[in-house]
Curated annotation (Swiss-Prot):
This is Calmodulin-regulated spectrin-associated protein 2. It is linked to Defects in CAMSAP2 may be a cause of susceptibility to epilepsy in the Chinese population. It comes from the Eukaryota. One of its GO terms (cellular component) is Golgi apparatus. It holds the Pfam family CAMSAP_CC1. Residues 922-1034 are annotated as: MBD region. Residues 668-679, 960-989, 1287-1299, 1334-1346 have a biased composition (Polar residues). Residues 405-415, 680-699 have a biased composition (Low complexity). Key microtubule-organizing protein that specifically binds the minus-end of non-centrosomal microtubules and regulates their dynamics and organization. Specifically recognizes growing microtubule minus-ends and autonomously decorates and stabilizes microtubule lattice formed by microtubule minus-end polymerization. Acts on free microtubule minus-ends that are not capped by microtubule-nucleating proteins or other factors and protects microtubule minus-ends from depolymerization. In addition, it also reduces the velocity of microtubule polymerization. It comes from Homo sapiens (Human). The modification Phosphoserine is found at residues 416, 418, 464, 598-599, 611, 673, 680, 862, 931, 936, 1008, 1019, 1148, 1313, 1319, 1321. Keywords: Cell projection, Coiled coil, Cytoplasm, Cytoskeleton, Golgi apparatus, Microtubule, Phosphoprotein.
Length: 1489
């Protein structure tokens, strides 16, 4: 074990990591972490990152994450930016970057601007506290982009791609950095594919000459051998499909393309076999690849990958810049630096990669070695045992680590995630499709056929069973899915799979599995050594995708080898690639297994089970006949599927015995068993619950479970993988089940809680198993009864026919043909009986044959609807039940006559062919006919002979009591189907037909859809397998009666031998037709055609067509020599057509006999034919009506859909129009409102202008009186000026109120006048106008004296109080004419100033104006603009703050301590005033707010 577990490999083994679910993944935190990790690494160097900066986050006591203060400080201080920027931007050492602004400027010089949500990031943003993280992320992203641009450019990428791709299209060239990175990845990966293709061609060339397998006398065997044994050759043709990268983030989440890129540059560090390349990547597969990439970057690229697994897996768009910089770093390493380990891959000739050197190359898994790595040194089965116990919980689907490839690259097997056996993952195991992780199909069509696997993915065999269902959409229907490989999610104690590690883990193994052909030959029986090896059930998919665990191809081949004494066995390459070899220690069991395997039972069983597997669906009935003789549609036979169920029980017996032995000998079978059914501690897909839960079982229980596992998929239609919870699902540790087997993986054995669960599962399974067996036994009884009944029916029907025809004389030809058929039938019956005596095998063989030969018989029992097989077995016709010795003797004599007529029938073939041509012409006139090519008589005869020799061949089957079975390969499959349909329709008039044993059958076919050659189909339920198309010779009965009774007897014998069921189901005509078919197919080997033709003319019918069996019609015709296919419209004259058919059938049988043969034997009744014709016409009419109705319905449906679509479009259009109208109306109303408001404003201004103009005179008169005011104002040095400043009305100025001024009590008249002309605005406010509009009106009125004319409305500025101060000066501080000079000067100073904010300085709380100051809120500086007072005022000097109230035209005291932009006036402490200054008279004190 130690040699297998290389410590380095162990270290590189990946465990399925615990990742955060998508719902819990914090994208913003991930972005911050990625950016900071990159920035810190670039600032300090990867090796020198301070410890406190390695993890930027810390968690507080409330479990909340925050960025560490040191990191925040470094960001705020710009140290990280300056360090990284100096490196990235290559700034001058003499002029290092200092501060955020320097870095921003340096980036700007490169054409990169730091923007956060389309806003330029400034140094102020980067200095903000608390830290504004979005600005810093934008800064780091810009630095990343600068680094990316330095490392990668479009020119560099194109130059690099030119090394690997000579051809360029202008449209392909990248247009930006991101596109350039994707272009580089795709070009390199394309080049890698080309290299692999070239290497593959070399390998193919090298392996073409290698023997693919041993020839066998059986053509069936020979056809199977290449596909199975040459699996390596076919698998070589599959290249890993490295996905194209079209979206850098989303297409990189599985790591396939990136890992392939790394492999190309570092093929010795990251081998292609170590990369998980699959069509459908599971979560674990993606994580595996991403871990592989991360580990590579960690070890070789200076830790340039600053992502977590979640970052790469979820690929948020926010980390695109991080991903780009990572790819740029890769490009720099691979294309610029090119360290020693970077050695771009080149085409390596065959054998250039020494296998033995592989251990020295870093490998990702201890279990990856190929069996072929060394011919003598095999890793022991316990390879994975040294893995730590903490890993033992890995779900089984991730635990199959074998990711190895042979030196020739045969089969790459990647474990889905961990490559480690016995670890548990962090996500629950999901139910998956029944095919677990096997990505290939086995095609047996041709030796050189390429196996169809999931499209061109690199890992042709993935051990992951998640998401790797067989791509049935890409697999042809006939490619059977025989998954002979070990199911993937089985957890073995030791990772070695039988295919790869062909040695037992125990040291007592006497020898290793031979690796060369000679050794394999000498150990021919090696395949039998393990019951659960090649011979144990494999996962087989039936037509419905359910698992049927049946023997695999290799098992069948091995059985054939054993029975046929074939000397050769597959080569080591093929063994390693999937042929399961087992250690010689099991040779003791060879005899036991051989008994079962070589027994005819097992041979046939295996073949039967495999029949659905072969691509052309050839069914081997126990004798290897040419492939042409094997019917093609066996895979559709439900009875065959049923048969495979019983088959497995036999297969189980040997394996059970071996299992018991295995357990007793303490052999670690798990290490060697690729079979799902092995009862091991690994919860394999087919393993029982007990095995998954680690309960030790007795051999009896084990047998029960093995059997259960076999039948789970088959009987229940679902794989045991789905029904049996695996250990990982049950959270039960996987434990070694047998005490004798040492624990190699060191997994804990939890047998307390797990035993309870397991024992319950055991009981459940036992009950199910008993039920299954009871059902199976009943089924077998039914089948046996059915077989006996068929034999009885055959004999009875034949004797009945003989009796009825006893009076007539049949022509020698007919006698000969009939005799031959009967003879063959009896021979076949005898063979069948002898086979049945052999035991289960013969019984199953007979069942297969019966199912093949007697689909019709089953139908006849159930004329129109499929009947439960059990019920079908019991059906029998009354005439067939009466059987006596005399009849049997007559039957035997008739067979002899048939033999003698064989030669004569051959001579008749020429004449029949002429007749066929005539009939074909008529058919063309009357109906649509599709006639398959008619095989030559020699070929058919030849086919007949081998089948006859085989005794079990399909050709002989028709003569047996079984219903006819076609011996012809492909044409028959189609023919069979149509014929089967005809049988079904004919069966409807069954009561009458039973009376008239054989003739009416031909007419019924036209009734059904089958009458249309292309439309003919048989429902599988009705005809499980139509192995042979039926030749319907319509009037067999009539002509035969005339010609000779013996010939009719012969024909009827044929019919009966083919299927007495047919006789029961069909009228005599049917039977005769069938006999002809059998004679034709067997003796004349005429192609049996499914088309049932109604012969339109009695004349043609009258023409003798004795050997209708001979292909009078092309393959379609042989079946219905007398039948002419008539189109539904042509079926109108059914009577006439039917009669000719009947006659013609008879006449075709006795072609030599002319019109005198028109005599109708009891089998032909014209009335019945007419009735059938009528029915056929009715059915045709019904069918036409139905078709017409369907077409009309379809048309109506289409019309309705079109109307609905039109209505929807109309509704959509109307809705859009309405929406547009509403928007237009809204816009129009808004415009009208705005216009109205504008006009109203102008009008108000004009009104106020006219009202205010006379006002100054009144004011003057009234103001003359208070002389103190005049004095007060005159004394002030500044004179007011008329209102240019007031003309620009701002929002501030408009906010003045309309209250009366309270400068002095003597102002009341003025205030009254003001109130008078403020009334319009008040009315407006009553009408709902905005208050600010009222205010503007008021202010404009108040400043009416200075207003010189209409002014444009100006939107007030929110940041300036300039207009408020102007208002205050004009209406409060320096109001009146006296102060006009002073006011004018002050306003002029204000206009000159650039300041936005002004402050008025009052002397004290009396609000006497002293001076005007400018105020800067940013710097909080207060400087004098004009007036008396200190040059500048500081915060400490301020005593009170005042706000101007425009409504009341006075200042209000603000009880605040902090100066802000909303303050309009201030006072300073009184001690700051010089008392010597003349004191101005006090004004009226304003009211304090």
């Amino acid at each position: 074990m130690g040699d297998a577990a290389d410590p380095r490999e162990m270290r590189k083994t990946f465990i399925v990591p615990a990742i955060k679910p998508f719902d819990h993944y914090d994208f913003s935190r991930a972005k911050i972490a990625c950016n900071l990790a990159w920035l810190v690494a670039k600032a300090f160097g990867t090796e020198n990152v301070p410890e406190e900066l390695q993890e930027p986050f810390y968690t507080d006591q409330y479990d909340q994450e925050h960025i560490k203060p040191p990191v925040v400080n470094l960001l705020l201080s710009a140290e990280l930016y300056c360090r990284a920027g100096s490196l990235i931007l290559k700034s001058d050492a003499a002029k290092p970057l200092l501060g955020h602004d320097a870095v921003i400027q340096a980036l700007a010089q490169k054409g990169l601007y730091v923007t956060d949500q389309e806003k330029l990031v400034t140094e102020r943003d980067l200095h903000k506290k608390p830290i504004q993280m979005s600005a810093h992320l934008a800064m780091i992203d810009t630095l990343m982009m600068a680094y990316t641009v330095e490392m990668v450019s479009i020119e560099k990428v194109i130059a690099c791609a030119q090394q690997y791709s000579a051809f360029f299209q202008a449209t392909d060239l990248p247009y930006d950095i991101e596109d350039a990175v994707m272009y580089w990845i795709n070009k390199v990966n394309e080049h890698l594919k080309d290299i692999m293709e070239q290497e593959q061609k070399l390998k193919e060339h090298h392996t073409v000459e290698a023997p693919g397998g041993q020839k066998s006398p059986s053509k069936w065997f020979w056809k199977l051998v290449p596909a199975r044994y040459r699996k390596e050759q076919t698998l070589l043709k599959q290249l890993p499909c490295i996905p194209l990268v079209e979206n850098l983030l989303k297409d990189g989440t599985d790591g396939c393309a990136l890992a392939a890129l790394i492999h190309f540059y570092c093929p010795d560090v990251v081998r292609l076999e170590d990369i998980c390349l699959k069509e459908t990547m599971s979560l674990a597969d993606s994580l595996y690849n991403l871990q592989l990439i991360q580990e590579f970057c960690q070890e070789y690229l200076n830790q340039c990958c600053h992502f977590t697994l979640e970052d790469m897996l979820y690929a948020a768009s926010s980390i695109k810049s991080n991903y780009l910089v990572f790819m740029a770093e890769l490009f720099w390493w691979f294309e610029v630096v090119k360290p020693s380990f970077v050695q771009p891959r080149v085409v390596r000739p065959q054998g250039a990669e020494p296998v033995k050197d592989m251990p020295s190359i870093p490998v990702l898994n201890a279990a990856k070695r190929n069996v072929l790595d060394s011919s003598s040194d095999f890793p022991s089965s316990g390879e994975g045992a040294t893995f730590t116990q903490s890993h033992h919980h890995l779900p089984s689907r991730y635990s199959r680590p074998q990711a190895h490839s042979s030196a020739s690259g045969g089969i790459r097997r990647s474990s889905s995630m961990s490559y480690v056996d016995g670890f548990i993952g962090t996500w629950p195991k999901e139910k998956r499709s029944s095919v677990h992780g096997v990505s290939f199909d086995i095609s047996f069509d041709k030796e050189d056929s390429v196996q169809r696997s999931t499209p061109n993915r690199g890992i042709t065999r993935s051990i992951s069973n998640e998401g790797l269902t067989l791509n049935n959409s890409h697999v042809s229907k006939h490619i059977r899915k025989n998954l002979s490989f070990k199911p993937i999610n089985g957890e073995e104690e030791a990772e070695s799979i039988e295919e790869e590690l062909n040695i037992d883990s125990h040291s007592d193994l006497k020898s290793c599995v031979p690796l060369n052909t000679n050794e394999l030959n000498s150990n021919e029986n090696i395949h039998y050594k393990l019951p659960n090896g090649a011979l144990q059930n494999r996962i087989l998919l039936d037509e419905f995708g359910n698992q049927i665990e049946t023997p695999s191809i290799e098992e069948a081949l091995q059985i054939i080898h054993d029975t046929e004494k074939s000397p050769h066995t597959p080569q080591p390459d093929q063994i390693a690639n999937g042929f399961f070899l087992h250690s010689q220690e099991m040779s003791i069991l060879n005899s036991n297994i051989k008994l079962n395997q070589s027994s005819p039972d097992n041979v046939t069983d295996t073949k039967g089970a495999l029949s659905p597997i072969t691509d052309n669906t050839e069914v081997d009935t126990g004798i290897h006949v040419p492939s042409e003789d094997i019917p093609e549609t066996m895979d559709e036979d439900s009875s065959l599927r049923d048969y495979t169920v019983s088959l497995d029980s036999d297969m189980d017996d040997a394996s059970k015995f071996l299992q018991d032995y295995d357990i007793r000998t303490g052999n670690t079978r798990e290490a060697l068993s690729p079979c799902p059914s092995t009862v091991s501690t690994k919860s394999q897909p087919g393993s029982s619950a007990s095995s998954s839960s680690g309960v030790k079982m007795t051999s009896f229980a084990e047998q029960k479970f093995r059997k259960l596992n076999h039948t789970d998929g088959k009987s229940s239609g679902s794989s045991s993988q789905k029904t049996t919870p695996e250990g990982s699902e049950l959270n039960i540790p996987h434990v070694v089940a047998w005490a004798q087997i040492p624990e190699e993986t060191g997994l804990p054995q939890g047998r307390d809680t797990t035993q309870l669960l397991a024992s319950e599962m055991v009981h459940l399974r036992m009950k199910l198993e008993e039920k299954r067996r009871a059902i199976e036994a009943q089924k077998k009884k039914m089948e046996a009864a059915f077989t006996k009944q068929r034999q009885k029916m055959g004999r009875t029907a034949f004797l009945t026919v003989v009796k009825k025809k006893g009076d007539g004389i049949s022509p020698l030809r007919e006698e000969a043909a009939g005799a031959e058929d009967e003879k063959v039938y009896t021979d076949r019956a005898k063979e069948k009986e002898s086979q049945k005596t052999d035991g289960q095998r013969s019984k199953s063989l007979a069942d297969i044959k019966e199912s093949m030969e007697n689909p019709q018989a089953k139908w006849l029992k159930s004329p129109t609807t499929p009947i439960d097989p059990e019920k079908q077995w019991n059906l029998a016709s009354p005439s067939e039940e009466t059987l006596n010795e005399g009849e049997i003797l007559e039957y035997t004599k008739s067979i002899e006559k048939l033999n003698s007529s064989l030669h004569f029938l051959q001579q008749e073939m020429q004449r029949l062919s002429l007749q066929q041509e005539m009939l074909m012409q008529m058919r063309e006139q009357q109906s649509w006919v599709i006639s398959p090519p008619q095989p030559s008589p020699q070929k058919q005869i030849r086919d007949f002979k081998p089948s006859k020799q085989a005794g079990l061949s399909s050709a002989i089957a028709p003569f047996s009591s079984d219903s006819p079975r076609p011996t012809h390969p492909s044409p028959q499959s189609s023919n069979r189907k149509s014929a089967s349909f005809s049988v079904k329709s004919q069966r409807t008039p069954r009561p009458n037909e039973l009376k008239i044993t054989p003739l009416n059958r031909t007419l019924t076919p036209p009734r059904s859809v089958d009458s249309l050659p292309r439309l003919r189909r048989f429902s599988p339920s009705q005809v499980p397998i139509q192995t042979r198309s039926f030749v319907c010779f319509g009037d067999d009965g009539e002509p035969q009666l005339k010609e000779s009774k013996p010939k009719e007897e012969v024909k009827k014998e044929e019919l009966e031998s083919k299927g007495t069921l047919e006789q029961r189901g069909h009228n005599p005509e049917e039977k005769e037709i069938k006999p002809f078919e059998s004679t034709v197919s067997e003796v004349l080997s005429l192609p049996v055609t499914e088309t049932v033709c109604l012969t339109p003319n009695e004349d043609q019918l009258n023409q003798p067509t004795e050997p209708p069996p001979k292909p009078v019609f092309p393959p379609t015709a042989p079946k219905n020599v007398n039948l002419i296919e008539v189109s539904l419209s042509d079926l109108k004259p059914p009577e006439k057509a039917d009669v000719p058919v009947e006659k013609y059938d008879g006449e075709s049988d006795k072609e030599q006999f002319d019109d005198d043969q028109k005599v109708c034997c009891g089998f032909f009744f014209k009335d019945d034919q007419k009735a059938e014709n009528d029915m056929a016409m009715k059915r045709a009419a019904l069918l036409e009506k139905r078709l017409r109705r369907e077409k009309e319905t379809q048309l109506r449906k289409q019309q309705l859909e079109a109307e609905m679509e039109h209505k929807k479009e109309e509704t959509r259009r109307k809705t859009e129009e309405e929406r547009q109208k509403k928007e237009d109306e809204r816009a129009r109303r808004e415009f009208i409102r705005q216009e109205y408001m504008r006009r109203k404003q102008l009008k108000l201004m004009e009104d106020m202008d006219t009202v205010i103009k006379p006002r100054p005179q009144v004011v003057k008169q009234k103001k003359q009186r208070p002389k103190s005011i005049h004095r007060d104002h005159i004394e002030s040095p500044k004179t007011p000026i008329k209102g240019p400043p007031v003309s620009s009305l701002s929002l501030a100025s408009l906010n003045t109120g309309d209250n009366e001024s309270v400068h002095s009590g003597k102002r009341t008249p003025r205030s009254e006048s003001v109130e008078g002309f403020l009334s319009p605005s008040r009315c407006g406010s009553r009408n709902g106008e905005k208050d600010w509009e009222n205010a503007s009106t008021t202010s404009s009125v108040a400043s009416g004296t200075e207003y010189t004319g209409p002014k444009l409305y100006k939107e007030p500025s929110a940041k300036s109080n300039k207009h408020i101060i102007q208002n205050a000066l004009a209406h409060c501080c320096l109001a009146g004419k006296v102060n006009e000079g002073q006011k004018k000067k002050i306003l002029e100073e204000m206009e000159k100033s650039d300041a936005n904010n002004f402050l008025i300085l009052f002397r004290d709380s009396g609000c006497q104006f002293r001076s005007l100051y400018t105020y800067c809120p940013e710097t909080e500086e207060i400087n004098k603009l004009t007036g008396i007072g200190p040059k500048s005022i500081t915060k400490k000097m301020i005593e009170g703050l005042y706000k101007y109230n425009s409504d009341r035209k006075q200042f209000s005291h603000i009880p605040a301590k902090t100066l802000s932009a909303s303050v309009d006036a201030i006072t300073i402490h009184s001690h700051l005033w010089q008392t010597k200054r003349p004191v101005t008279p006090k004004k009226l004190l304003p009211t304090k707010a």
